[in-house]
């Protein structure tokens, strides 16, 4: 392969659109886009060799627990206003947990500081499915093959999943049309009570209106009509790799999933 690249005329093409990628990078980096202001958090890991030779590992999670217990308060946070404040807090924690005769294990310390809030973005050509731009998070890359929030982080898709797991199968194979009507009224199934975001109900409502207004009750009742298995099957066929059998329930129509989905796969589903 090495010779083919440099001597054999092998050509490697990328789907990336540099102009679109530049716009995405600039917008993600623009602090004016974040109303709450930028905070900094971190992942921390280090080891301490205690006086008796015991090795203990400390992390950002043990740090949270330590100060919540010490301060007798659940309000302690590892979100700070600057990277310098993060490093100062880490240094103080290391000082606090080191007892007399204890030593920090050489080369055991790992600190990765990230900006908050974080962000992920995927831009895809709907006609070809080609990824034209992708953003895996805010901040400077700390190295190659680092964590990419667009391709690896799973989040709850919420109402974006209504089309995927309910209305697409309902219109395509479930015998429904945009003019089909459901009664938008209080709904309890088993021990689960469903509600709308507004906590109001509109009576008989078309699927067309339910989509434009993102009405939960109509969505759940539509999935009841066509069957959960059909909705789950369509979601699988849209290419979601993180679905599990525990997602075979009415909650899938509202995007309530066990693991969630990635930004990349959600974008790809809408580009199909």
Q: Residue locations for each model-derived region?
A:
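Penicillin-binding protein/beta-lactamase superfamily catalytic region
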Residues: 2, 224, 255-259
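Periplasmic/cell-envelope proteins involved in peptidoglycan metabolism and beta-lactam response
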Residues: 4-155, 160, 180, 235
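Extracytoplasmic/secreted proteins, especially bacterial periplasmic and envelope-associated proteins
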Residues: 11, 19, 23-26, 165, ...
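Active-site SXXK
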Residues: 24, 128-129, 155-182, 210, ...
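Conserved catalytic neighborhood of penicillin-recognizing serine enzymes
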Residues: 175-231
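Short, charged, amphipathic alpha-helices and their helix-cap/turn boundaries
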Residues: 226-243
């Amino acid at each position: 392969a090495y010779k083919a690249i440099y001597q054999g005329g092998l050509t490697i093409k990328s789907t990336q659109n540099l102009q679109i990628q530049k716009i995405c990078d600039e917008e993600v980096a623009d602090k004016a886009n974040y109303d709450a202001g930028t905070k900094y958090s971190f992942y921390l890991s280090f080891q301490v060799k205690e006086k008796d030779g015991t090795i203990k590992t400390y992390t950002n999670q043990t740090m949270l627990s330590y100060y919540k217990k010490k301060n007798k308060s659940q309000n302690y946070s590892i979100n700070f206003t600057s990277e310098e404040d993060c490093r100062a807090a880490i240094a103080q924690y290391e000082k606090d947990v080191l007892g007399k005769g204890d030593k920090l294990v050489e080369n055991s310390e790992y600190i990765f500081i990230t900006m908050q809030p974080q962000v992920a973005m995927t831009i895809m050509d709907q006609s070809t499915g080609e990824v034209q731009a992708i953003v895996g998070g805010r901040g400077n890359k700390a190295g190659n093959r680092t964590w990419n929030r667009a391709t690896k982080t799973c989040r709850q898709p919420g109402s974006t999943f209504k089309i995927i797991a309910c209305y697409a199968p309902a219109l395509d194979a479930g015998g429904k049309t945009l003019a089909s009507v459901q009664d938008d009224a209080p709904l309890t199934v088993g021990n689960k009570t469903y509600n709308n975001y507004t906590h109001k109900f509109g009576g008989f409502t078309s699927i067309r209106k339910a989509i434009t207004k993102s009405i939960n009750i109509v969505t759940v009742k539509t999935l009841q009509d066509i069957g959960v298995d059909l909705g789950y099957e369509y979601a699988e066929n849209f290419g979601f790799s993180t679905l599990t059998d525990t997602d075979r329930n009415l909650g899938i129509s509202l995007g309530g999933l066990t693991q969630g989905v990635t930004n990349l796969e959600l974008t790809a589903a809408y580009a199909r």
